[in-house]
Amino acid sequence: MTDELILVYNYKNLKKALEYRKEELDQKIICFDFISHKHLRKLGISHNFAEDYIESKEKELIDNTTREIMFSWYDNDDIKNCLIYKNLNLGWLLENELYGYFLEVIKNFISLKKIIKDEKPKKIVSTDSLCAISKEISKKTQIEI
């Protein structure tokens, strides 16, 4: 059980997140992006990488499921007609952009769920986006933006 988790969503939030570090507390820093991970490693700051909480089989399942959804949603009969313009399905134009976005969101959600389950923190300090997801996953943990 960890007293406090400091979640770093991206590099631009890293400096703010590090302000919450206190040597006397049992804290764990977990970053969700590779740039923050590299920077923390360069600074010699102990941390974990969020994706390390997901097993490779789960990563593959997340990737395949996201791909299956994102490359077929616009062909759904219920919405297909709303997306047709001059015989072109506009949903097709969005598939690559949406795939990357949803893949990141789903990976972050699964990572966060596993992190909270494994670490059992008393408190989570995070940025806005991860904070909202954390609140949905763990109603018992004190969460601070």
Locate each region found by the language model.
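Conserved N-terminal ligand/cofactor-binding loop architecture of enzyme catalytic domains
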Residues: 2-145
